[in-house]
């Protein structure tokens, strides 16, 4: 293996990952081909044999054995040498492995895949740094206080009390990865409570970076930084959603929702509340309780730590409690029935809350996938929002007529008529 062969290997891995997706997040992943799967373990061994860098491969055997056990059970269940872990086969595979249920199976698979993928990222990071040192030591370009860009990565040059979120925001906004070394520096970072305004604003910039958020978030998550910032995240990390609508685990879905919400920030008066609401809208999942109600309870201490006002916390609780309202109402109720519009009016206090809820509904639907968010469903939601806006402005739903006792008596005898003019 020469250097050019390693470059070929990297390109091959990137192409395969693009085709098969992430083993850690997909609900029906390919155990062998997906990112974080068995072929990535073989690639890590090949990199190690090359000798260009040293990789800790001791724990790879345990990870590989765990994935091979899953694959062996899968082949036994499906009677074929197919490596895609289909939804309808997961319960049987879990039973064969003597696990509690398919949720435990998929959570274990996700955790293993994330570890493999992280080790792969570390390996390529070491390789790229070695190549840089073998030629010349570049100087970092300063982009913010104690933050620079070196070799197309954002790096932390020195530690200060709030540097972690500032570095995450800068990486997300620049569309660059945050270096693995920098992520590891932040493992024990703690902000004062409530968070300073600078940290809160950088959090919004971080999660508002669109598609760039994905790899920065994952690098921080693998280093343990995300759970240090948000301990509540651990309950949904790698948590599977075993239904035909969702594509991703709960945590990955919430990150994807924030990514989709970033494209909608210009449609709302408070982009910060939209982004934070999107990132935590399913934080209540993982128990038998109503996840919307539980999530509304969990967001309160999170938002207090972040430093939001009482009014903003109330808005975030509203968004999480009612994040399914518009989609469920639009698809299950008659939009021509005034009672349908009144149902929304009774729960949504004003136009500002409605626009935030509408944007969150769109982001949630797009992040879930086409099976859950079709053009038809989007049109229904848009129509419901349009009618509700008109009602809020007093142009659609008239107040319910109040009848006198005499009129009620006539109505009971079918003798009451009303003429509108």
Where are the regions a protein language model picked out?
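Broad gene-expression machinery/nucleic-acid interaction feature
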Residues: 38, 275, 415
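Non-catalytic interface/linker regions that flank or bridge core catalytic/transmembrane domains
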Residues: 1-244
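Divalent metal-dependent catalytic cores for phosphoryl transfer on phosphate-bearing substrates
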Residues: 55-56, 77, 95, 249, ...
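Extended hydrophobic/Leu-rich segments
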Residues: 3-6, 10, 260-263, 420
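Long, K/E/R/D-enriched contiguous segments that form extended
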Residues: 198-277, 286-292, 297-298, 304
